[in-house]
Amino acid sequence: MIEALLVATGGFFGAITRFAISNWFKKRNKTQFPLATFLINITGAFLLGYIIGNGVTTGWQLLLGTGFMGAFTTFSTFKLEAVQLLNRKNISTFLLYLSATYIIGILFAFLGMKLGGI
């Protein structure tokens, strides 16, 4: 039961944080590129890598990794925004968004793990 509570608590704060950051960026950046989701997912990849690399206890992994990072990052919004770019026939931004998110996300997760100690 405590594990579920840790995940739920982390998820609550992760979702609220993503909502706030996403709205802040969208109000200030009027661009075709989905900058808010991109930065949230890259930051989340780095932080999750750092959490895992740091060797934190299972409780902290559940709270911060599964809960907070699981709700903070967003695979579904990433895919939706990519499809919307395609529907608007914005192929160059679509390709940039897809490739940058995957490549930079993996690099930042690796960097987080290295800085965390793995």
From Swiss-Prot:
One of its GO terms (cellular component) is plasma membrane. Keywords: Cell membrane, Ion channel, Ion transport, Membrane, Metal-binding, Sodium, Transmembrane, Transmembrane helix, Transport. It is found in: Cell membrane. It comes from the Bacteria. It is a multi-pass membrane protein. One of its GO terms (biological process) is fluoride transmembrane transport. The keyword Transmembrane helix applies. It catalyses: fluoride(in) = fluoride(out). Pfam families: CRCB. InterPro entries: FluC (IPR003691). The chain crosses the membrane at residues 1-21, 33-53, 55-75, 91-111. GO terms for molecular function: fluoride channel activity; fluoride transmembrane transporter activity; metal ion binding. Na(+) binds at residues 70, 73. Na(+) is not transported, but it plays an essential structural role and its presence is essential for fluoride channel function. Fluoride-specific ion channel. Important for reducing fluoride concentration in the cell, thus reducing its toxicity. Belongs to the fluoride channel Fluc/FEX (TC 1.A.43) family. PANTHER family: FLUORIDE EXPORT PROTEIN 1-RELATED (PTHR28259), FLUORIDE-SPECIFIC ION CHANNEL FLUC 2 (PTHR28259:SF16). This is Fluoride-specific ion channel FluC 2.
